[in-house]
Swiss-Prot record:
<dbReference type="GO" id="GO:0005737">
    <property type="term" value="C:cytoplasm"/>
</dbReference>
<keyword id="KW-0143">Chaperone</keyword>
<comment type="function">
    <text>Required for maturation of urease via the functional incorporation of the urease nickel metallocenter.</text>
</comment>
<comment type="similarity">
    <text>Belongs to the UreF family.</text>
</comment>
<protein>
    <recommendedName>
        <fullName>Urease accessory protein UreF</fullName>
    </recommendedName>
</protein>
<dbReference type="GO" id="GO:0016151">
    <property type="term" value="F:nickel cation binding"/>
</dbReference>
<dbReference type="Pfam" id="PF01730">
    <property type="entry name" value="UreF"/>
</dbReference>
<comment type="subunit">
    <text>UreD, UreF and UreG form a complex that acts as a GTP-hydrolysis-dependent molecular chaperone, activating the urease apoprotein by helping to assemble the nickel containing metallocenter of UreC. The UreE protein probably delivers the nickel.</text>
</comment>
<dbReference type="InterPro" id="IPR002639">
    <property type="entry name" value="UreF"/>
</dbReference>
<dbReference type="InterPro" id="IPR038277">
    <property type="entry name" value="UreF_sf"/>
</dbReference>
<keyword id="KW-0963">Cytoplasm</keyword>
<keyword id="KW-0996">Nickel insertion</keyword>
Length: 225
């Protein structure tokens, strides 16, 4: 276990947008809203982003991170995530970025727990989801749960906003305003995740899931999801 406070720089590296996990290639459904004209400027993307943080990231990724910290096995959580991530592209995005994070983490932030999870994935006994790979690394570094949640959620917000700046498109200053506003959503989500019950896992807005499913058949696409 890392000494108290010694994890900050490692956590910044782990959540940096330069970490090559492939997040730049995923809209996680907002490209469908762009195609339908529902997301078209700073304000409309901000509405989508707030809903995504408050719903999908809270009840899926965030809750999985919390449960892993509380002692639920990553094998059990991996199976639950695979089952409740209904849109195929979203499921594949989670495992592609998660598998890449496992590869990076094994070399840069090695730990017995991370090696065990990667071995399960390599043996085909787990899918290798991004939030679990992140949580295993963060916990091994000694990052407290609330900081781990906030860092993961804000990293997701940052990559999605960067992708929206390219796709809508938006100005760079607009992107920074969105990030500042989203910090309040992230703080609220961290608090909410701490209160959720096991039965809340996967309780995602159908509208978000439908948009992610429609993206598979969208004729022109910038993103893989």
């Amino acid at each position: 276990m890392a000494a108290a406070g010694s994890y900050q720089l490692a956590l910044q590296q782990l959540t940096d947008s330069a970490l090559p996990t492939g997040a730049f290639a995923h809209s996680l459904g907002f490209e469908t809203y762009i195609e339908r004209g529902l997301v078209h400027d700073e304000a409309s993307f901000g509405v989508w982003l707030s809903a995504f943080v408050g719903q999908q990231l809270s009840y899926s990724d965030g809750l999985a991170i919390r449960f892993l910290y509380e002692g639920v096995s990553f094998a059990e959580l991996d199976a639950l995530l695979t089952a409740q991530l209904l849109p195929r592209q979203l499921r594949e995005a989670s495992t592609k970025m998660g598998t890449r994070l496992l590869e990076i983490g094994t070399e840069v932030f090695p730990s017995p727990e991370l090696a065990e999870y990667r071995a399960l994935v390599g043996a085909g006994r787990a899918a290798g989801h991004q939030p679990l790979a992140f949580a295993v690394v963060a916990r091994s570094l000694g990052v407290p749960l609330t900081e781990s949640l906030a860092a993961y959620l804000f990293a997701a917000v940052t990559s999605l906003t960067q992708n929206a700046v390219r796709a809508i498109p938006l100005g760079q200053n607009a992107g920074q305003r969105l990030l500042r506003k989203a910090s309040d959503d992230v703080a609220a989500a961290v608090e909410r995740i701490g209160r959720l019950a096991p039965d809340d896992f996967g309780a995602v807005s159908p509208g978000l899931e439908i948009s992610q499913m429609r993206h598979e058949r969208q004729r022109a696409r910038m993103f893989m999801s």
